[in-house]
Curated annotation (Swiss-Prot):
InterPro entries: MttB-like_sf, MTTB_MeTrfase. Disulfide bonds: none annotated. Gene3D superfamilies: Trimethylamine methyltransferase-like. GO terms for molecular function: methyltransferase activity. Induction: Up-regulated during growth on L-carnitine. It catalyses: Co(I)-[quaternary-amine-specific corrinoid protein] + (R)-carnitine + H(+) = (3R)-4-(dimethylamino)-3-hydroxybutanoate + methyl-Co(III)-[quaternary-amine-specific corrinoid protein]. One of its GO terms (biological process) is methylation. Involved in the degradation of the quaternary amine L-carnitine. Component of a corrinoid-dependent methyltransferase system that transfers a methyl group from L-carnitine to tetrahydrofolate (THF), forming methyl-THF, a key intermediate in the Wood-Ljungdahl acetogenesis pathway. MtcB catalyzes the methylation of the corrinoid protein MtqC, using L-carnitine as the methyl donor. L-carnitine demethylation generates the unusual biological product norcarnitine, which is likely degraded by other members of the gut microbiota. In vitro, can methylate free cob(I)alamin. Belongs to the trimethylamine methyltransferase family. This is L-carnitine:corrinoid methyltransferase. It comes from Eubacterium limosum. The L-carnitine:THF methyl transfer system is composed of two methyltransferases, MtcB and MtqA, and the corrinoid protein MtqC.
């Protein structure tokens, strides 16, 4: 298995300490703007300096908060749990929040509720996705004359066996019967009631800080609601170099880390021991087009910088993903996905967001790319596992080599155990059958193979075996066309 993190290739211990020193200076000298009076009062009560809505956090307070951040935690789904944290392999979660879909026929369309259901089924039948999430939010197909916050959560729950990541935030547009803060908590309480647990982590969520060095009022309402309801939070930075972050990658990492840590500290002051995820989706800007570039190599470098810092702070880190700037499931999309997935997969990461399907700088998701990205993840999981080097393996291999000798062959009898353990046999998505004319005709294009996998998964999908009470609860919020017949 992997013995050293990829971060060690790029950052020496002194480098990480240098980054940390930069973070401390930003936290204590520049501060973070927090748009929530209650939070400002909590910071002040614990000794932080607060001036005109800006919080200044010193090293002592930071270290105190870091001591209570759990290294690991468990997410509860409908009928399964997932272990997340520093002592586990990365948990892969799907794309979320993309407003457009690239369809199998090559057309583009706005993501709608039917797309949501299709992707929920795809996620639920995935062998690499351990958590599900809203693919997009506030989409066409929802009744916008009504509050749609809980309707979208109910739709996700109906089709999911797996634990859920709730990218959906309460807003003044999808929750009108009260404040945003009330909507956040009602959504969480709905999830607790559906799963039947008040003392487990049944829904984790997060939102973005505002770069540079701010946390807006809606984000604060979101964070505060989850902290008070004792559910895990993901604190996300998504800055752009030379626009909302300095031009240097060093500056990008340090600035974002300070903003993320401000909410880590708040969470532990309010609810010591609450699981938090340190999340970065920041990347470079291409100033020729003033465009965020999620497929750039700098995205991987920024990601690795944040992994190194989060590991230094002993906070579970959620970074990277099969992201990119391509708008077709083409060679560019594949390269970008691999670069974005490689950094967290070959290091000590707790979770990988946007694991499958995302492209177009967060604006687009693709059915076929989702299937292809799953195979990329399997390849990287195989790389992460490495291969066994031991006296037992050595003696067996040398015995076989000695027995066969020069110019022999090793084919004979049953396939040996070590072959089955050491070799990953790719799925039908990738071709490994050669390239003769009949093979080319039989295999077709990779998009055709992805479509076959998709169709088989849709046919194999089965709804969770919900109780009558759970069905009734979901029916109170589900969009009309998705209600259970009971």
């Amino acid at each position: 298995m992997i013995r050293n993190s990829l971060t060690d290739v790029f950052f020496a211990k002194d480098d990480v300490e240098n980054l940390h020193e930069g973070v401390l200076r930003v936290l204590s000298k520049v501060g973070v703007k927090i748009e929530n009076d209650e939070a400002l009062g909590i910071f002040e009560q614990h000794g932080a300096r607060v001036e005109n809505g800006t919080v200044y956090i010193g090293e002592v307070l930071l270290n105190k908060a870091l001591q209570t951040v759990p290294a690991n935690f468990e997410l509860q789904g409908f009928d399964r749990t997932v272990q997340v944290g520093l002592d586990h392999d990365p948990v892969v979660i799907p794309t979320n929040g993309t407003p457009m879909v690239l369809n199998f026929d090559g057309s583009y369309s706005d993501t709608n509720t039917d797309d949501l259901v299709n992707f929920y089924k795809l996620i639920d039948t995935s062998d690499v996705m351990q958590v599900t999430s809203e693919i997009a939010v506030d989409v066409p197909g929802l009744d916008k004359t009504k509050d749609s916050l809980l309707a979208q959560t109910a739709l996700l729950m109906k089709y999911s066996h797996k634990p859920i990541y709730n990218i959906l935030g309460a807003t003044i547009h999808n929750y009108k019967k009260g404040s945003v803060a009330q909507g956040v908590r009602e959504n969480i309480q709905f999830a607790k009631k559906y799963y039947g647990y008040d003392d487990k982590y049944v829904i984790y969520s997060g939102t973005c800080v505002i770069s540079p060095l701010g946390v807006g009022w809606e984000a604060m309402d979101h964070f505060m609601g989850f902290i008070k309801e004792n559910q895990p939070i993901s604190i996300t930075a998504c800055s752009m170099t030379n626009l909302t972050a300095p031009g240097s990658l060093y500056g990008s990492v340090v600035e974002d880390a300070a903003a993320i840590l401000s909410i880590v500290v708040l969470s532990q002051l309010m609810n010591p021991g609450l699981p938090v995820l340190y999340t970065s989706l920041s990347s470079m800007s291409d100033m020729r087009y003033v465009q965020l570039c999620m497929g750039a190599p700098e995205f991987a470098l920024i990601t690795l910088g944040h992994i190194a810092l989060a590991n230094f702070y002993k906070i579970p880190v959620r970074v990277g993903g099969a992201l990119g700037d391509a708008f077709k499931a083409d060679y560019q999309a594949g390269v970008e996905s691999f670069v974005g997935l490689m950094a967290p997969m070959l290091s000590q990461s707790a979770m990988i967001p946007h694991g499958c399907g995302t492209m177009g700088s967060f604006n687009l998701t693709s059915y076929e790319k989702f299937i292809m990205d799953e195979e990329t993840i399997r390849y990287l999981m195989r790389l992460r596992r490495g291969f066994e080097v031991s006296d037992k393996r050595k003696e067996k291999a040398l015995k076989d080599i000695t027995k066969v000798g020069p110019r022999g062959n090793f084919l004979g009898g049953r396939t040996p155990k070590e072959y089955r353990e050491d070799n990953y046999l790719a799925s039908e998505v990738f071709n490994r059958k050669g390239c003769k004319e009949n093979t080319r005709e039989e295999q077709g294009d990779i998009r055709d193979r992805a479509r076959k996998v998709y169709d088989a998964r849709m046919e194999a999908y089965e709804l969770p075996d919900t109780t009558l009470e759970q069905k009734k609860l979901l029916n109170t919020e589900l969009p009309e066309q998705y209600k259970f017949d009971i």
